[in-house]
């Protein structure tokens, strides 16, 4: 067991999906995995291991924000030996061409957080996805006919930002969306030499406010990113 995860050694697969919402983890386990067994209920951050198309895969919630995903991702990597981690979550569009329910694959993540600068105050350390996972996810999504955007995202420490207009300005520089976890996940992956990718469904738009989704939709639908994430985890080189 680790401090925040109750699993015993061997109960977590070396490939894992990481939704922020623990109820989304439960949904994925119940609807996509066979013979799913719950390995964690600590703080109601549900985690499950089962099989997907014959491959052993885990799924676990991470909560909201970079501090939270940093705790769970680090323990999964260091204490349980996870090698491939794919975040599946929601994001807000910063770009006129990126619409609600479409997918964004984060090739890199800018951030306004100090979580990385605390380690590297003299550098702007780049947070980038595993190219292997990114390449596989892109081709899988396209083959499945899903509208998919690849580009940079903003990982923000603040949901209710006082810099709303500056965030929107990033969209004009090609940043596709804003979310709250990818940069920290990519940083941990670089530190520990594992593979990570963030796949997001656009749940709302900062540039087209009339585009929106409900909390129930965000929890129980958005299945395209789940399919792409699972297919990417089991794809052979």
Curated annotation (Swiss-Prot):
Protein name (record): Purine nucleoside phosphorylase DeoD-type
Assigned EC number: 2.4.2.1
Keyword set includes Transferase: yes
CDD domains reported in the protein's UniProt record: PNP_EcPNPI-like (cd09006)
Annotated Gene Ontology cellular component terms: cytosol
Entry annotation: catalytic residues: 204 (proton donor)
Quaternary structure and interacting proteins, as annotated: Homohexamer; trimer of homodimers.
MF GO annotations: purine-nucleoside phosphorylase activity
Catalytic activity: a purine D-ribonucleoside + phosphate = a purine nucleobase + alpha-D-ribose 1-phosphate; a purine 2'-deoxy-D-ribonucleoside + phosphate = a purine nucleobase + 2-deoxy-alpha-D-ribose 1-phosphate
Residues that hold phosphate according to the record: 20, 24, 43, 87-90
Single biological process term from Gene Ontology: purine nucleoside catabolic process
């Amino acid at each position: 067991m680790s401090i925040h995860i109750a699993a015993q050694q061997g109960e977590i697969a070396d490939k894992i999906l990481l939704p922020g919402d623990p109820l989304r983890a439960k949904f994925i386990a119940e609807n996509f995995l066979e013979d799913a067994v719950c390995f964690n209920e600590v703080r109601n951050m549900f985690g499950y291991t089962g099989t997907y198309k014959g491959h052993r895969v885990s799924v676990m919630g991470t909560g909201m924000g970079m501090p939270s995903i940093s705790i769970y991702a680090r323990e999964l990597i260091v204490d349980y030996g996870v090698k491939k981690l794919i975040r599946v979550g929601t994001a807000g569009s910063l770009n006129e061409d990126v619409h609600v329910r479409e997918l964004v694959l984060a090739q890199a993540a800018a951030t306004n957080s100090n979580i990385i600068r605390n380690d590297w105050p003299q550098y702007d350390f780049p947070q980038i996805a595993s190219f292997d996972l990114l390449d596989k996810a892109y081709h899988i999504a396209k083959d499945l006919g899903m509208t998919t955007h690849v580009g940079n995202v903003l990982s923000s420490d603040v949901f209710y930002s006082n810099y709303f207009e500056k965030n929107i300005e990033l969209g004009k520089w090609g940043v596709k969306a804003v979310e709250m976890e990818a940069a920290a996940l990519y940083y941990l992956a670089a530190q520990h030499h594992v593979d990570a990718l963030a796949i997001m469904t656009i749940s709302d738009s900062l540039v087209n406010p009339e585009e929106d989704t409900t909390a129930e939709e965000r929890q129980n639908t958005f299945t395209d990113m789940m399919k792409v994430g699972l297919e990417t985890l089991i794809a052979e080189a």
